[in-house]
Amino acid sequence: AIHQRIGKIKRSGIIKEFTLSLDEKKLGYNTCAFVGVFLDKNSQYTEIIEKLKRIDEVVEAHYTTGEYGLFVKLYTKDNDHLMKVLNGKIKKIKDVTRTETFISLEEPITRNISF
């Protein structure tokens, strides 16, 4: 019964894929940060996304409303590594005018939508 239900949900497109959940800290990535990225031209965001995809530390990117053109989640080994990623990679992308960084202190809720 469970196998049939999972098959039905998968065929309907509700389940996109099965993934592993990694413990970033056990891999040495102790800093989780969210970065609001200000863009010179929001119309260039697809090109910027392609460049962000090449940065291994970036795990999510969202094109958003509000102050930021993009909101990015990344993992780094520590704050020094974070600074190197921000200054040496993200801020060097053409049309990124500035960033605002939020360091996550804890992640008390992690879940998918219930259905």
Which residues fall in each region the model found?
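A compositional/biophysical signature of low hydrophobicity enriched in polar/charged and small residues
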Residues: 1-115
